[in-house]
Amino acid sequence: MCKKICIFMAVLGLVLSTDLSARKAKVSIETPASDSRIEYTGRILVNGDDVSYDWSGVYFRIKFSGPYLAMKCSDTKNCWFNLWTDKEMSPKADKVFMVGAADTLVVLAEGLGKGEHEVILQKRTEGEQGRFTVHSFITEGDILQAQGRKERHIEFIGDSYTCGYGTESHDKNDPFMAETENCNLTYAAIASRYFGADFNLISHSGQGICRNYDDFRPGYNMPDRYSLTFDESPEHIWTPDMAPYRPDVVVIYLCTNDFSTARQPHETIFAGRYIELLKKVKAYYGDDMPILCLASNVTPFSFDYIRNACMMSGLSNLTYVALTSGIHNYEDDLGASWHPNYRGHIKVASSVIPYISTITGWEMEEKPYR
């Protein structure tokens, strides 16, 4: 009798083991990164199953059923990311991690409850830190259609301030470190969250309108990079039909580096290149696209340069604003290398938000800037 029971239990165990293995194999689903149900925001290049990008702040939303989500990916250097599960983007991510190798498997979520879930993954570092490629996603349930884009969208064009250089540092004497660069804590992200808007960033540290920081790489400035799909490569030219969105307003925050290291650019050259950038934006999105032009607090001359360039352009729907030196303090509001930290960026955002409200007609609500 005992022998029969043992044989029965052994057979039952084998059946259960085989059944569980079959179920496990059945529910492991691999989906290409280019699947249309996954929603990317920012400049990307789709190549077969792969999706690649390097600009700051590019993010995707992926909705799925089941407890598990993993990503097969590659990185050319060391990109850092913010991740949120089952919530909107906020100042504090659920998870922060770095990818620094090719053909890497990253578990984005596991142990989730039954039902539908959504993960948002945002690239928090800029193009100099690497190009990122998503190959595919692994789930134990179905990939579902992402929730859809927000009704509002803002595009920001800028330099290290827009990239989030040093935002997580609390000492202005700290050097640059990739792990303290976080575009999600910039004025751009704060303003976008305030209005409940999607956003994309076209930004690169050290870039100017006609002169980069300390004259680095003369003759190649932000008006040139703006035409590119990848920040760090001129190989692919970007066109607006490559994106499934059109911004409601474009914000340009450039000129700090033009006046860097106690130098002043020739105003005629500056105006010519600024107008070139304005015309590129208008060519992409139409003459009716409103553009908010922010003058840096680096020098009082920056506002005169930008205002004069806008007036010379002959273009409509341009607003120019000066951010003066008193917009934040130079102790607690600064992070690495004298760049605004999160606290400083909140103050910048609080000055920019009213102008965006006026330009777009979006009402300002009684809620904190965060």
Locate predicted features.
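Bacterial N-terminal signal peptides that target proteins for export
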Residues: M1-I7
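Conserved beta-strand termini and adjacent loop/short-helix elements that scaffold enzyme active sites
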Residues: T41, I202-H204, L294, L323-T324
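Alpha-helical cap/lid subdomain in secreted, periplasmic
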Residues: D224-Y369
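Conserved beta-strand scaffold positions in the cores of enzyme catalytic domains, especially
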Residues: F156, F199-L201, Y320-A322
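A structural signal for isolated positions on well-ordered beta-strands in alpha/beta enzyme cores
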Residues: E118, E155, N200, P290-L292
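Bacterial N-terminal signal peptides
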Residues: F8-V15
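Conserved SGNH/GDSL esterase-like catalytic core that processes O-acyl groups on lipids
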Residues: G57, R124-Q129, T167, N173-T268, ...
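N-terminal secretory targeting modules
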Residues: C2, L20-I157, Y161-T180, G361-R370
